[in-house]
């Protein structure tokens, strides 16, 4: 105080300390959480500081990596269990609004009104508990007449006057309810459970909620959900994990999954750690009692304490598949037991290892795009990203009838319809050709 201001008194001392704490909270999200964010104590009693758990640190690091790189924050979060992913996301959004950017509106979209309201209530509680000096930048005096947060004229909008920003809630039951805003951040929760009917489409709700969000730094869109079969959320998850024929990512969203073994409460110390470790190694190929699966958990990162907990918890279930459904170890397992799947998703993933690139990719054309001449003068031409893929060219030295079996899966003719897929399989049971079209 003496060096900078030439004097010292209690008020000046407090001002300097508050400014130091504000800068600390601005550039250290983890400090902001523990020092100022308070969450419900699951064991009862008073609220407790928000100390990030390893799974929440993993999520926060994903957000921070994008923010520090000057990129828009886009994440699709697959939740295996309730570990505080929504809480961490919402507190991070509050950190952006309070500490970094003014007039930065946000929206919370839930599959039901109760789910969106619950997330918002937690948000309002957080804002109410923050100290006033965090809301004002250096040199700006506190305005004691302004509440930290207040209603925004309608029941689904709240305002933070000192930061000139809004928090809005909407539901998937009302696809148009999110329109008319200028949000910069969106938290879409339990997306896999959003209704999908002729009148309700999750894609329309996402468009209503997120289409106005610019692709610029500090903007944020998060899809988070537990799995629920094949739907819009599963399609978006697959897109986030996929690349095109040039190796470019298909989605702007980064996929993030947190397995049960990354949640620290799912751990138990064995009576003899060395004996337990030796048992895992000795029985690593033993399929009886699922010991091979126990060892596999070790290879993917589970701790000895975590595997021991899993082994004991598994005894509460008649079948290991019931355990895997409640506590999935990887994304494949998470989707395997959700919804109504025809094929065993693990077996599908095993078959993917034997996939190979086609020897030809492009298109086929005739003398005319339609009509009888469409099948005359057929020619192949290579094109990256073409819909025609050939894995085995015909061997003209062979004279063999009925060499190929051709199947057709009929789709629709509109751009939004399923594709019609034509597959030709040679008598050797190798897929020789596949193409898809809107016919």
Language-model regions, residue ranges each:
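Extended hydrophobic-aromatic, low-complexity segments
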Residues: 178-180, 196-197, 415-419, 431
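Gly/Thr-rich phosphate-binding beta-strand-loop-beta motif of the actin/hexokinase/Hsp70
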Residues: 400-426
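Phosphate/NTP-binding elements of NTP-utilizing enzymes
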Residues: 1-408
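Conserved small/polar residues in nucleotide/adenosyl-binding loops
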Residues: 428-435
């Amino acid at each position: 105080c003496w060096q900078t201001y030439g004097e010292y008194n209690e008020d000046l001392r407090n001002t300097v300390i508050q400014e130091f704490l504000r800068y600390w909270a601005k550039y250290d999200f983890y400090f902001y959480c523990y020092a100022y964010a308070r969450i419900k104590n699951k064991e009862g009693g008073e609220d407790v500081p928000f100390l990030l758990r390893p799974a929440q640190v993993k999520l926060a690091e994903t957000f921070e990596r994008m923010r520090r790189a000057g990129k828009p924050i886009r994440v699709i979060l697959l939740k295996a269990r309730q570990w505080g992913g929504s809480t961490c996301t919402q507190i991070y959004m509050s950190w952006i609004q309070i500490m970094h950017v003014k007039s930065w509106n946000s929206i919370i979209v839930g599959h039901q009104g109760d789910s969106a309201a619950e997330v918002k209530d937690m948000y309002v509680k957080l804002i109410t508990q923050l100290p006033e000096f965090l809301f004002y930048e250096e040199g700006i005096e506190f305005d004691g007449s302004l509440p930290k947060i207040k209603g925004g004229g309608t029941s689904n909008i709240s305002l933070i006057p000192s930061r000139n920003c809004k928090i809005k809630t909407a539901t998937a039951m009302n696809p148009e309810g999110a329109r008319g805003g200028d949000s910069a951040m969106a938290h879409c929760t339990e997306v896999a459970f959003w209704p999908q009917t002729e009148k309700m489409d999750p894609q329309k709700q996402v468009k209503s909620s997120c289409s106005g969000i610019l692709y610029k730094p500090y903007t944020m869109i998060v899809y988070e959900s537990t799995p629920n079969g094949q739907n819009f959320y599963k399609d978006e998850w697959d897109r986030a994990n996929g690349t095109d024929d040039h190796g470019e990512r298909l989605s702007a969203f980064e996929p993030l999954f947190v397995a049960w073994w990354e949640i620290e409460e799912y751990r138990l110390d064995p009576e003899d750690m060395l004996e337990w470790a030796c048992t895992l190694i000795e029985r690593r190929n033993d399929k009886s009692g699922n010991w091979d699966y126990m060892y596999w958990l070790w290879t993917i990162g589970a701790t000895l304490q975590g595997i021991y907990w899993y082994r004991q918890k598994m005894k509460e279930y008649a079948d290991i598949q019931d355990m895997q459904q409640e506590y999935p170890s990887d994304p494949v397992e998470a989707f395997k037991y959700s919804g109504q799947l025809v094929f065993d998703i693990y077996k599908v993933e095993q078959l993917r290892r034997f996939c190979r690139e086609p020897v030809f990719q492009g298109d086929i054309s005739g003398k005319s795009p339609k009509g009888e001449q469409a099948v005359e003068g057929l020619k192949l031409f290579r094109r990256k990203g073409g819909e025609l893929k050939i894995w085995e060219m015909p061997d003209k030295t062979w004279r063999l009838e009925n060499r190929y079996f051709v199947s057709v899966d009929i789709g629709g003719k509109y751009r939004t319809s399923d594709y019609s897929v034509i597959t030709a399989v040679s008598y050797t049971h190798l897929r020789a050709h596949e193409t898809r079209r809107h016919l």
